Structures are given as C-alpha cells and as structure tokens.
Amino acid sequence: MDMFWFIPTHGDSRYLGTSDGARQVSAEYVTQVAVAADTLGYEGVLIPTGRSCEDPWVIASSLINATRRLKFLVALRPGLMAPALAARTAASFDRLSGGRLLVNLVTGGDRGELEGDGVFLDHAERYEASAEFIRIWREIIAHSHSGESYDFDGKHLQVKAAKLLYPTVQRPYPPVWFGGSSDAAHDLAAEQVDTYLTWGEPPDAVAEKIASVRSKAAALGRTLTFGIRLHVIVRETEAEAWAAAESLISHLDDETVERAQSAFARMDSVGQRRMAALHSRGQRRTRADLEVSPNLWAGVGLVRGGAGTALVGDPQTVAKRIEEYAALGIDTFIFSGYPHLEEAYRFAELVFPLLPRTVKQKLPGQALSGPFGEVIANTIVPRASAR
C-alpha cells in the first residue's frame, strides 16, 4: 500500500471559493510541500496539468534536488507536446532524478481549454490520439536501451526513424499511469498503461471500474495495478473532522457553486459527470447531502474540477475506509488536503501508523533527532502516550 501526496500548483488555501486564507504558489512553497512529503515517508507526489496550473515539468524539475527519495507522478498531455519531445523530456528527468519519474497520461475533458491549446478533437478522437501518443512515447524510450530507432504511422500521429540517444534509468520506460471513466479510457488503460487511476467514487462504483479494466487487460494477457485519487480531512475526533469539512466550504455561496457546476457541465469528460452526479450540482450543502458513502464527502467537488471527494473522519475511521478500498484492489492512494503543507503532516502523523504499509528505512542520520517532540526540562526525552 503506497501513499502519495499532491503538489498544489493551481493554488492552495484554508477555504474553497474565496481568496481568504489563500497562499501564493511560489517556488518556496511547493518545495516545502515536496520536502514534507519526502521527509514524512510518502512514496511520491502527483503534479497536475492544465491552464490553471503551473507547468508540471518545470515544477517537478525544480524539486529533484530538494528531495531524496520522493517519486514524481508528472502529468503529460497529448497534443501539447510531440511524443518524441515528450520522450526526451521524460528521459532527461528520469536520469537527473535517479529513476524517480512516473508519468500520468492526461487526455483532457474541457473542450474549451483543449481548443485554446490548439486541440480540436472530439472525445473519441482524443482517445485515439492519446493511444497513439503514448505508444510512440513508450516505444521510443524502450528502443533507446538498444540504440534502435522506431517508426509509427497512425491516424493522428506519425514518426519515422525516431530515436532517443540517452535512455531512461527505468526499463523499459518510466511507469505510465492513466485515469478515465469511459469505455475508450478503459480500453486504453487495458492496452498500454501500468497503473489505472480512478477518482474517489463510492466503493461499489470503484469496484465496477476495476473489474472492467482488469477484465479488458486480462483479455490482452496484461495485468495492471490500481490507484485512487482522494482528498482527506482527518482529525483526532469525528466531530472535529466534520467541523473542518464544513469550514472548508463555509465561504461558498450559491452563485459561486452554480458558476462552477455550469463550467463542469460543459465538459465532455465522463469522469467529471460522475463526480458532479454525486452532489446534484450542489443545490444542498449539508453533511447529509454531501456524504455520498460512509465518510466519503463530495463537498470539494462543488467548486473543484477533477477529484472532488474526501475521506472525512478520525484516524481509525479513515484508515478503515482506506483498507476497504485496498480490499477492492487499490494499491496506491493519492491524497491531498487544504492547506497541503499542514495536512501532509496531519495525515501522515495520524493515519500512517494505522495502515499496513511498508515503513521506509530512515536515511542516514535522519533518526538522530527524533521524532520525539520537545525535550522535557532540558533532560528527559518524551515517550509515547498511553492512550
């Protein structure tokens, strides 16, 4: 069971839908979040893409030397970069980071944004182009280890004698992650990706998606691993956690929610439609309306695109819900929380000890100063509490 965190390159705050409590997405701040994740024992971080985000490859590259073991799940958008250039970019990053690159293929679902980026393809065509893109990307990198070139003649993309002179550390190529809820997305995942990633839907819905992708992959003689993308709001008690959830959306008004939901409704993303369906366009915002499954809260999705649900509860309850998803076949959990720096610590401190995960060996010298809290009376090292 691997735990990932999230680099908030599209902004961070204590509240949704307001500039109150907002933080600047500076080089210093994203470095703080990455270093915290690395120090706390998260396996990696997801770095998103889109016009609302800083460029994921620039951000990820800036964090290589600030971290020691952290893996970088970097978003890659077909249509914004030629596959051969994407292969060179990925290979350079993988070498410079010592083999810490993971790639998240993002097809995109906001037609307005896509057209602004010069991509004028419908839903079916985008998946065709994405499949061709990632095939070329994979094969160019795989061929680099033997020094061979690669040809491809597809409907949307073609390369002739494509060659990568400097191969990746990871063989045959850095692992490819991908998420999508349509049949076309499941087909692409089954054929080409290593980890299928789903947003945090109720367990029954997640189980259906896993079964679909797993069945399609098995028919091709392939196996995949599975991940889930969620927010988390954990506190020492259930009451405190739900109060924090209410606080997160306390600045939202009907106009802001309606504008956000109208924007989401214009997208042709099946996954985004599934997220929106969980909260009925935000017409009501009580816990009873937004708790769509035990401890699974859809409040984030009122105004945030993409992953719109959070696990909410005390440490024991959150750990139990995580284990329920793991029992479905989820191997990797990608979490985030507002604000991302403090919540990275809170989640790791409260929930990590309760999970059946591999505890990383501490780096040399890392344990010499704790963690054990502040020394008592200048002479006594604190012990764990009895509770």
UniProtKB/Swiss-Prot annotation:
The keyword Nucleotidyltransferase does not apply. One of its GO terms (molecular function) is alkanesulfonate monooxygenase activity. It is an enzyme of class 1 (oxidoreductase). Gene3D superfamilies: Luciferase-like domain (3.20.20.30). It catalyses: an alkanesulfonate + FMNH2 + O2 = an aldehyde + FMN + sulfite + H2O + 2 H(+). Disulfide bonds: none annotated. Its EC number is 1.14.14.5. Keywords: Flavoprotein, FMN, Monooxygenase, Oxidoreductase. Catalyzes the desulfonation of aliphatic sulfonates. Belongs to the SsuD family. This is Alkanesulfonate monooxygenase. It comes from Xanthomonas axonopodis pv. citri (strain 306). The gene is ssuD.
